[in-house]
Amino acid sequence: MKTIVLAANDDLGLDGEMAQHFGRCPYYVVVRVNGDHQVEQTRIEANPHARQHGPGEVPKFVHSLGADVIVAPGMGQKAIAWFDRLGVEVATGSRGQVGATLQAYLDGAISGATGCKGE
């Protein structure tokens, strides 16, 4: 099993829209997939740090959700470094619907981390 966390603008789960930045997104969609990339479980978690957060708070929260992977459109270099220290894979460059983004990640179309000028 792998736990993939996706930054979302809303609480619609896989039918929702990806957020533009992982740290200030209002929600995270937490998806557990099996070895065949089949979705086993989906849940939605509110981001307690959406309005304000200090260094490392959001990566620590995402890690506490059991994340093996965080998928977001963009992320700052400091956050990428935090996730690296926590052992969470970062995949950036996603846009559009959460479910389509998840499938793109599972298909290998989204991978690796490119830092943005944000936090």
Functional labels for PLM-detected ranges:
Residues 1-53, 57, 65, 85, ...:
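Non-catalytic interface/targeting segments
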Residues 59-91:
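Mid-chain, well-packed structural core segment of small domains
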